[in-house]
Amino acid sequence: MTTLELNNICKKVLAQGCMELGLIEKEEDIGKYYMHGVSHHLGIDVHDVTVEGVKLMPGSVITDEPGLYIDEWEIGIRIEDDLLITQDGCQVLSAGIIKEPEEIEAFMAQ
């Protein structure tokens, strides 16, 4: 899979959700709420430059950070994971980090 293919899959999933919520009428309209890519490489720097279309190879480390920004609801949602690409898929390096709203709110209240 390439980084471009990964981003296209993400756009389809986010568009479907936005259509179900009545935010957009067709997939092509997702750019109103999703204005960046889903991923970039990590390793050399904090935010490595990723060239679209580069095949994801075992040993690569990338982010998984789809984000939706819904101005009319005054909300932005973007939760990141870091992934190690393996021969058979990926290993979620950030699996132990809290992500559920209740967990985040409890942590912030400390």
Tell what function each PLM region has:
Residues 1-110:
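Active-site neighborhoods and metal-handling regions in enzymes and metal-associated proteins
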